[in-house]
Amino acid sequence: MTDVIRAEGISKSFGPVAALTDISLHVGRGEILGLIGDNGAGKSTLIKILTGYHQPDGGRLLFEGEPVTLKSVVHARSLGIETVFQDLAMVDDLPVYLNLHLNRELTHRPLPFLRRGEMKRRAREALDSIGISIPSVTTEVGMLSGGQRQAIAVARSVYSNAKLLLLDEPLAAMGAKESAVILRLLQELKQRGDIAIILIAHNYGQVVDVCDRVNLVQHGEITFDRASADTSVAELLELVNAEYRLGGGQ
């Protein structure tokens, strides 16, 4: 399996506070890596480094086997690194097809008129290609369920030819039915075999079920890296709780 992204010995500090210490991870095409850990463990900082928002103080990144310095979020996106956050960054009163093309609108150059017909067609094709069921691409996003909205956010990244997709708590505040929509979508993307996925989640059952491997981040370090088939929710909970007890519950 070819690694899409590989981090080697990544460190990051903010003033006297060490956010990451000697972090190494990798994820390849057709693979889902689960990233777990308590709030403040360093997951968000790591994601921001992988998406060009922060630059590391030490270590290096390799993208598709080549050393890379991600200078900005825009630079990372130009390489095919896309992120879906919990807040989605979508416009509720715009229809699905315009949200899917947000900041990527098709126009009749040199005139600034939108090619709405083609945008609708491409939006429908993008949704159908990964099995997302939406009654109409002209429906306003604000009228959809949380699971449908999150699915559209994922589809937007895939439509942008993502090679690495990072999902930051995509299932937070979702019910079981809506979560199932996203978990099925992730499995569909995995089966395509052309996208590497990093999933940050607090539901360890979902992580074990959908991910190929699990990394546990504690105090800015990866302390656990194992295939999901070789671990369990009980083991992950014990690792986190043991660290919590050793820390005196702080």
Map each language-model feature to its residues.
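Glycine-rich phosphate-binding loops of nucleotide-dependent enzymes
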Residues: 2-250
